Regions:
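Membrane-interfacial terminal anchoring regions of lipid-handling membrane enzymes
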Residues: 1-154
Length: 154
């Protein structure tokens, strides 16, 4: 998605879970699902990666259980990241989070950045002790896919 549908809720949950166990309220999952379905997403890209086959898994047969599971998870991540399409918002968040202009011009315009900054500004309405931490978590939701996708290519 160009716009993460529950980005504010996700950021707040992660923020709260840093200092206390986050306990979901009754019906919160259903509310998140409905919000995710009905909320504006902007551009949407759907990719189906190649199926993980028995032959793929055989490469890890000699590994003990936990290592086997880790390697299968890495394989799944590689498949997902290979088909992931990054959006301008991912690159904007990455540049803001790390104080750079690495992707400006190539991956996003000033207009796109202004739109993202307007969206980001809405975080100010949340009364939290460490707003900079909440902002970093929020930016991470959008910027982490950049790191994940670039790691697979390097």
């Amino acid at each position: 998605y160009e716009w993460e549908t529950c980005d504010y809720m996700k950021a707040l949950e992660l923020y709260q879970s840093r200092s206390e166990k986050y306990v979901k309220k009754q019906g919160e999952d259903l509310s998140s699902i409905l919000s995710g379905i009905t909320s504006f997403k902007g551009d949407v890209h759907l990719t189906f990666c190649p199926m993980i086959t028995e032959q793929d898994l055989m490469a890890y047969d000699s590994l003990p259980g936990i290592e086997y599971n880790r390697e299968v998870a890495k394989l799944m991540d590689r498949r997902i990241h290979a088909g992931y399409r990054l959006t301008p918002n991912n690159f904007i968040a990455h540049d803001i989070r790390f104080g750079k202009h690495e992707f400006k011009g190539d991956r996003y315009t000033d207009e796109q950045k202004d739109r993202f900054l307007h969206h980001l500004k809405k975080l100010e309405k949340y009364d939290v002790d460490e707003p900079e931490v909440l902002m970093d978590i929020f930016l991470g939701i959008y910027s982490n896919p950049v790191d994940n996708c670039f790691e697979r290519n390097h």
